[in-house]
């Protein structure tokens, strides 16, 4: 099987062309390939498939390192766009793809940046999914070690966002897995820890479900900005600094799609026998 190793701000991926080669992965195979000592090593596996809808260009599938399939990965979306362009699978600047939970448009810009239309944030608790009687800007979550206030939103996948005073000392290692597996998130959740520098600049760490803390999480950056805007803490254009680098997030509020812009880097191509 041919593959490419790529990363978006240090969030690393193996990307596989499922259009021109036949590929099938079991969860066990994915876990073996994801192993950084005995396999290739990655945060997520991305598969490019032929479109299910003839009006779209591709179908986009995402698997976490633990073998679980998820419906969204923002950093992966940028790498997906870079991959299909580099491999000559398309020459379009605007690439329309489907995912498990909807469609998105990936735009390849001339300055090596990829702009992704992430769609509208979803706030209705049942659709996140999150257990709550109604939408609120802040929810109280109790864990074994502390009670936190968080915002909850879906960016095609579930996120909770906790505001912290100092991103460096935030208790991500202990609190992250407790939030990820909290009973009020029936499909688990990506936990974001956000420090607000000013209304147009935040710092963020994300503990991703099925992957742990990563160098960057594109949908997590989108979720943090969306929550901050809904809470009246942020403006419409925000720079998000993650451990692996920075993203620009734009959102004009309810009823509008959210946009993420950032880099996508090709590292190497390889071949492996499954």
UniProtKB/Swiss-Prot annotation:
GO molecular function terms attached to this record: diaminopimelate epimerase activity
Entry GO terms, CC: cytosol
Matching InterPro entries: DAP_epimerase_AS, DAP_epimerase_DapF
Biochemical pathway: Amino-acid biosynthesis; L-lysine biosynthesis via DAP pathway; DL-2,6-diaminopimelate from LL-2,6-diaminopimelate: step 1/1
Disulfides per UniProt: none
EC number: 5.1.1.7
Functional description taken from the UniProt entry: Catalyzes the stereoinversion of LL-2,6-diaminopimelate (L,L-DAP) to meso-diaminopimelate (meso-DAP), a precursor of L-lysine and an essential component of the bacterial peptidoglycan.
NCBIfam families given in the database record: DapF (TIGR00652)
Protein's UniProt name: Diaminopimelate epimerase
Organism: Haemophilus influenzae (strain PittEE)
């Amino acid at each position: 099987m041919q593959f490419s190793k790529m990363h978006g701000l240090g969030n690393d991926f193996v990307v596989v062309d499922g259009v021109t080669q036949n590929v099938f992965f079991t969860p066990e195979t994915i876990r073996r390939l994801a192993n950084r000592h005995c396999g290739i090593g990655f945060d997520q596996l991305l598969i490019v498939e032929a479109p299910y809808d003839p009006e779209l260009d591709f179908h986009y599938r995402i698997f976490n390192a633990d073998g679980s399939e998820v419906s969204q990965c923002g950093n992966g979306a940028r790498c997906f766009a870079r991959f299909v362009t580099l491999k000559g699978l398309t020459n379009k600047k605007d690439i329309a793809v489907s995912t498990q939970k909807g469609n998105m448009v990936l735009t390849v810009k001339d300055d090596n940046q990829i702009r992704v239309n992430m769609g509208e944030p979803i706030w209705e608790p049942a659709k996140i999914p999150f257990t709550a009687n109604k939408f609120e800007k802040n929810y109280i979550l109790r864990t074994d070690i502390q009670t936190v206030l968080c915002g909850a939103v879906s960016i095609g996948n579930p996120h909770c966002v906790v505001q912290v005073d100092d991103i460096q000392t935030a208790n991500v290692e202990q609190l992250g897995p407790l939030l990820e597996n909290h009973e009020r998130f029936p499909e688990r959740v990506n936990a974001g820890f956000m420090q607000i520098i000013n209304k147009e600049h935040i710092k963020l760490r994300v503990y991703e479900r099925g992957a742990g803390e990563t160098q960057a999480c594109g949908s997590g950056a989108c979720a943090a900005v969306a929550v901050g805007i809904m809470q009246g803490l942020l403006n419409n254009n925000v720079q998000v600094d993650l451990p692996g680098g920075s993203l620009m997030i734009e959102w004009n509020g309810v009823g509008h799609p959210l946009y993420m812009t950032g880099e996508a880097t090709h590292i190497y191509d390889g071949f492996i026998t499954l």
